[in-house]
């Protein structure tokens, strides 16, 4: 081999490459361990109405350590997404010494049961709110479907000048509504058929629906009414 210039050149090239790789790895390790390039600032982007600065600082305190190169960006993101009102967080490095976090908050659409909220994507979360919100309830995993049906039911009753204040999906998967004038409606289990029956009732009721406190729409060709005095 020592008399073969071609093999000697190949060996020399291999050794040079190996030395370069070792130097690169050494430089990377030094950069990761170096006290230089500390993260000096974390900037927060996004429209925040419910998340307090103190909550963000507490979430970041245990996660922002190391330097610009070694800081655990995924860990910072996960810590921010554990805050009650943060739906999604994106975190990136900005040279030379900054992290930038963009936060998206939940937009509460309704209360879910006694202790949770549901956002406009039909996702349940736990967060405090004093807003006057409609109330949803249903089996676990039905949040998205209840949210979607709420939008449609609300659209249907608009001509009556009322709003849907409560949507219930029972354990037997039957739909029930309460309007903001106190009227309750039983819609049955078939949600698509329920929408059709609700449309038919709205057309018939015009603005007289406030005279009734209960409407049973589970009949295929009509509906039953109960008055405030208990008469049908």
Describe each region flagged by the PLM.
Residues 1-41, 50-67, 71-82, 88-232:
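Charged, solvent-exposed interaction patches on well-folded alpha/beta domains
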């Amino acid at each position: 081999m020592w008399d073969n210039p071609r093999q000697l050149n190949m060996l020399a090239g291999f050794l040079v490459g190996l030395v370069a790789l070792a130097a690169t790895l050494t430089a990377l390790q030094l950069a990761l361990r170096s006290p230089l390039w500390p993260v000096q600032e974390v900037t927060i982007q996004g429209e925040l109405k419910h998340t307090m600065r103190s909550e963000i600082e507490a979430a970041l305190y245990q996660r922002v350590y190391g330097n610009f190169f070694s800081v655990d960006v995924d860990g910072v993101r996960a810590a921010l997404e554990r805050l009650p009102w943060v739906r999604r967080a994106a975190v990136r490095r900005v040279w030379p010494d900054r992290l930038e976090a963009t936060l998206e908050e939940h937009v509460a659409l309704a209360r879910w049961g006694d202790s949770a909220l549901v956002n406009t994507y039909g996702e349940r979360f736990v967060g405090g709110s004093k807003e006057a919100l409609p109330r949803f309830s249903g089996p676990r995993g039905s949040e998205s479907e209840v949210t979607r049906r709420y939008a449609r039911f609300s659209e249907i009753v608009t001509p009556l000048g009322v709003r849907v204040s409560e949507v219930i999906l029972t354990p037997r998967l039957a739909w029930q509504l309460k309007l903001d004038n106190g009227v309750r409606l039983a819609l049955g289990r078939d949600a698509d058929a329920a929408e059709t029956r609700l449309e038919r009732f709205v057309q018939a009721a015009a603005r007289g629906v406030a005279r009734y406190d209960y409407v049973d729409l589970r009949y295929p060709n009509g509906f039953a009414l109960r008055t405030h005095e208990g008469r049908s």
